[in-house]
Structure formats: C-alpha cells, structure tokens
Regions:
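Acidic/His-rich structured neighborhood in mature extracellular/periplasmic domains
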Residues: 55-169, 175-183, 187-191
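N-terminal module-boundary/linker segments of secreted carbohydrate-active enzymes
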Residues: 1-58, 68-76
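Phenylalanine-focused residue identity feature
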Residues: 13, 19, 29, 140, ...
Length: 191
C-alpha cells in the first residue's frame, strides 16, 4: 500500500506564529525530511495488511507520509527511522548505507547488492551468497525489509550519537532502547 502524495511536510505545516524554521544545509537529511511527501489529510494510518490503525480524525495524527509499507509486519518505529535515513541516502545516489542487527552484525546494502543474503545461523545471523547482484529500488526495499527483521531500537541506539536537548535538529531521534522499546524521529525544528 502506498498512499498518493498531495503535498509535502513543509507545505502543510507552517512554523507556529513568531517562529521560523531552523536553516538547514542543502541536500541534508533535515532538508529532505521537510519535503517528505504527505498523503491527503483524510488518509488514515494503516497497518502493513491494510487495516486502519488510526482514523484520519484521530487527534494524535498530524499527517501520513506517502511511502509504501512492506506487506510483512516489519516496519516498526526504529525501522521507520532507518527507512527514512536510507531513502534519503538513496535519493542522493549514495549506496553506502549500513545498519546493525540486534546481534551486532553489520548489514550494509553493498553486500545485499552483490547477491548476499542474511540467514539465521544458530542463535545468530550471517551473510551467505544466495542471489544475483541487484541495484534497483525494488531490491533495495527488500534489503530494508531484511534490515527491519534483524535490527531494533537497541541496535539503532548503539549506532546513535547523543545530542544535547538544546541542539536537537531535524533528523535526530529520541530512543528508548529495549524490547519493544520505542523511537521517535524529529522531522523539523523551528525557533
């Protein structure tokens, strides 16, 4: 399921009166987040299987990002942080993205694109040659789903760098590691 975009975060959400968006560098993650495509305002939040999780009228919902979601129940909170970061890198033509599994194994796109796949190995996971080299976005999405299956808030927290509260910028995130844990991405900042 991929809702159709109607506008962007920057277009829909103006800074509060008396505030201005914090300047961001061109081509930065923060700038890319400001231009996230949003679905129409009446779009509900849907689960991976199409079920409505939250009605569009739910007061907790400000907007729905117009991106596809895997048909498997994989993209959770920390995964969404990694997904947006990876999609930003992809949009810039960068292919050096790498995330970590909960067990610590590095999960770089470069290995997946060479035809390797992640498989269980006892209590751990490992890379094995199992496919053909791939380089398109559909293969990249399959790679991300594999990352989502093996990464979590704990592994994301281990890759993160702490930020002082007065230095928070778009692209930073709050994380409560654990099982299940939680992560929330900062999409924009105004001062």
């Amino acid at each position: 399921l991929e809702p159709k975009p109607t506008d962007t975060m920057r277009q829909r959400f103006a800074p509060p009166a008396g505030f201005a968006r914090v300047p961001v560098a061109p081509n930065s993650f923060a700038g890319w987040l400001r231009d996230l495509p949003l679905a129409a305002p009446e779009t509900p939040v849907r689960a991976y299987d199409g079920r409505v999780l939250h009605a569009a009228t739910d007061s907790r919902i400000a907007g729905v990002v117009a991106l596809d979601v895997s048909p498997a129940d994989l993209q959770q909170c920390a995964d969404s942080v990694m997904r947006l970061h990876a999609e930003w890198l992809w949009s810039k033509g960068e292919r050096n993205m790498s995330y970590r599994a909960a067990a610590g194994l590095a999960l770089p796109w470069s290995r997946w694109s060479r035809g390797e796949r992640i498989v269980p190995s006892g209590a751990n996971i490992q890379w094995v040659p199992a496919g053909k080299p791939v380089s398109d976005h559909a293969a990249f999405r399959k790679y991300l789903d594999a990352v989502f299956a093996w990464a979590n808030t704990v592994s994301l927290e281990k890759q993160a760098k702490p930020v002082e509260p007065d230095q928070i910028r778009a692209g930073d995130f709050f994380i409560l590691p654990g099982n299940p844990g939680h992560a929330v991405l900062v999409l924009d900042v105004a001062e």
